[in-house]
A protein has these predicted regions:
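N-terminal [4Fe-4S]-dependent radical SAM core
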Residues: 38-67, 74-75, 241-291
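Radical SAM [4Fe-4S] cluster-binding motif and immediate context
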Residues: 267-345
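Low-complexity, highly charged intrinsically disordered N-terminal segments
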Residues: 66-71, 75-89, 95-104, 109-112, ...
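Conserved structural-core and active-site-/substrate-pathway-adjacent residues in large, well-folded domains
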Residues: 90, 134, 138, 147, ...
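Glycine-rich beta-alpha loop elements in corrinoid/cobalamin-binding modules
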Residues: 103-252
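Structured alpha-helical segments in the cores of large, soluble enzyme domains
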Residues: 54, 125, 170-173, 177-180, ...
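Helix-enriched interaction subdomains in cytosolic or periplasmic regions
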Residues: 15-43, 93
Length: 345
């Protein structure tokens, strides 16, 4: 066992199922092709999974599958709090499961392309193109080229218009999703604002598509359904006008699609004490400590600050809950350092 899922024979799978597990023999693992590549790269630990706190080791064959992808290396992406929160929330749902992926470093990408190994989940080493949704975290504009590279590495058409009903939906969220047009030709949907609540609505919509068997021509119908969810922008459902390369207006193509996309905002941080099980990495990463979010938003209102504008209003986590999260987190992870995260603590 070298990843979050047992990778062996049908007999092993049957034994697991007999003990109450639900790992499916239909699940594909790239591990037999991936393992021989690891001695040839600088940091194999970036690609093997098995971190303490990982909870995507049970495959739910009938659930909507999300591949939460950070378009930068493992060292940068693993500590990302937003990705860890969504990872935990989705895996708590009976109708969904989430796994993680990170952009490979150049040495690993070269090995993967030479061996025809596509982008994969670090949890189960399942190919990215077998997931229903590949969702990217857009933390900064400088990762946009990595987004396109990851889509291509996954074996998915880079341009959204060229994808078929059998291809995953490609989504994006994070701060840069508030300016979606630079990636509108490549991303099927963008999420504006907090993700904790909207992922439930999206899982339901995509789940209905799964239940229908994804018939020919149905991709547009699921995108139409997503476009009706508050906080979700689907570029293919809108006509965007430009005047001499400058944005001049946007118009929905359907009467039931929101003309103006509102951002999603969770009202009370106390209702969302996540992540409860912060991932503990296998190798050195940035921000290698316990992270506890103490509030969102910013009271200062500096006009030059994008984050301060788009994360309003200010929502504070109760001090008692902060203490509880710190105590439980230190005990579980073994960390001896805590970062109290916010925009302006």
């Amino acid at each position: 066992k070298t990843s979050g899922v047992t990778q062996n024979t049908a007999a092993d799978d049957l034994e697991m199922r007999a003990r109450g597990g639900i790992i499916s023999v239909q699940m594909t693992s790239l591990w037999p092709r991936l393992e021989p590549l690891l001695p040839r790269v600088e940091k194999p630990a970036r690609y093997i999974g098995c971190e303490d706190g990982a909870n995507a080791n049970i495959y739910k064959p009938d659930a909507t599958s999300w591949l939460l992808t950070y378009p930068d290396t493992y060292e940068i992406g693993l500590p990302n709090q937003g990705l860890q929160i969504l990872y935990e929330l989705l895996n708590e749902r009976p109708d969904a499961f989430a796994e993680r992926s990170y952009a490979p470093w150049t040495d690993m990408e070269a090995q993967m392309r030479a061996a025809n190994v596509p982008l994969f989940s670090v949890d189960t080493h399942r190919p990215a193109n077998e997931f229903d949704i590949i969702a990217f975290n857009l933390s900064a504009e400088l990762v946009y080229t990595n987004v396109l590279n990851c889509i291509d590495l996954a074996g998915v058409p880079v341009r959204a218009a060229e994808r078929s009903d059998t291809d995953p939906l490609v989504g994006a969220g994070g701060h840069c999703a508030y300016n979606p047009e630079p990636l509108a030709d490549f991303v099927d949907f963008f999420v504006m604002g907090d993700g904790e609540e909207v992922i439930a609505d999206m899982t339901t919509a995509v789940g209905e598509w799964r239940k229908s068997g994804k018939p020919t021509g149905s991709r547009e119908s699921v995108l139409h359904a997503l476009a009706r969810i508050p906080g979700v922008y689907v570029p293919s459902m809108y006509d965007v006008n430009y005047d001499d390369q400058q944005f001049s207006g946007i118009r929905a193509r359907h009467a039931d699609v929101q003309q103006r996309i509102p951002k999603r905002t969770i009202a009370d941080l106390a209702d969302w004490p996540y992540p409860r099980n912060q991932l503990v990495p296998l190798t050195e990463v940035v921000h290698d400590r316990l992270n506890v979010e103490i509030f969102r938003g910013c009271t200062r209102g500096c006009r030059f600050c994008q984050a301060g504008m788009i994360t309003r209003p200010v929502r504070e986590r109760p001090a008692s809950q902060v203490r509880e999260m710190i105590s439980a987190g230190l005990e579980r992870t073994g960390y001896d350092e805590v970062s109290l995260t916010s925009l302006s603590t």
